[in-house]
């Protein structure tokens, strides 16, 4: 979780941002919370909230406030940040059908995406629903397209070398599906993306977490998302 590297030369990333959590502790570290509160930010944390897995990571730059809401809802407000990513979903991930809605308003670089990891092989994946000033279609290796959920997604791969991951510093592959028409609500049929990737030789492993994530890099903005 640090840097879109190859795919985003100027962007640090949703990738490797938050390691999985073994417990279901939903509380933030009080000392860290106090320290970040003085700077107007929320500390990094992962866990469970109202029946959903959540992950929030920040490099500590700028001002970013992540708030877990009722059910599958969360909100993020950020100003002049370095890099952060956060959201709600499930652990483990699966080929589920995801419904979500809300608002996503970045000023600068940002993503709204279904984001997750698998192990054996170690894969970091994104189904990008919307983005800010940087279009991830600009980078990576184009593999094909998939038509699903009322839109077309371009499929890409990229490789991260010696980068942070849920297994520590590793070299691993990223899989991307990037929607050509931006949106901030609807249905994401993950089985259709996974099947399309598989047909292209892009195989997944054992699922770790899977969230509907908001990410920002050197930008400002706001996001309010509910996962169903």
From Swiss-Prot:
This is Probable endo-1,4-beta-xylanase A. GO terms for cellular component: extracellular region. It catalyses: Endohydrolysis of (1->4)-beta-D-xylosidic linkages in xylans. Belongs to the glycosyl hydrolase 11 (cellulase G) family. Pathway: Glycan degradation; xylan degradation. The active site is at 124 (nucleophile), 215 (proton donor). GO terms for biological process: xylan catabolic process. It holds the Pfam family Glyco_hydro_11. Endo-1,4-beta-xylanase involved in the hydrolysis of xylan, a major structural heterogeneous polysaccharide found in plant biomass representing the second most abundant polysaccharide in the biosphere, after cellulose. It comes from Neosartorya fischeri (strain ATCC 1020 / DSM 3700 / CBS 544.65 / FGSC A1164 / JCM 1740 / NRRL 181 / WB 181). It comes from the Eukaryota. One of its GO terms (molecular function) is endo-1,4-beta-xylanase activity. Residues 1-18 form the signal peptide. Coiled coil: none annotated. PROSITE patterns: GH11_1, GH11_2, GH11_3. It is found in: Secreted.
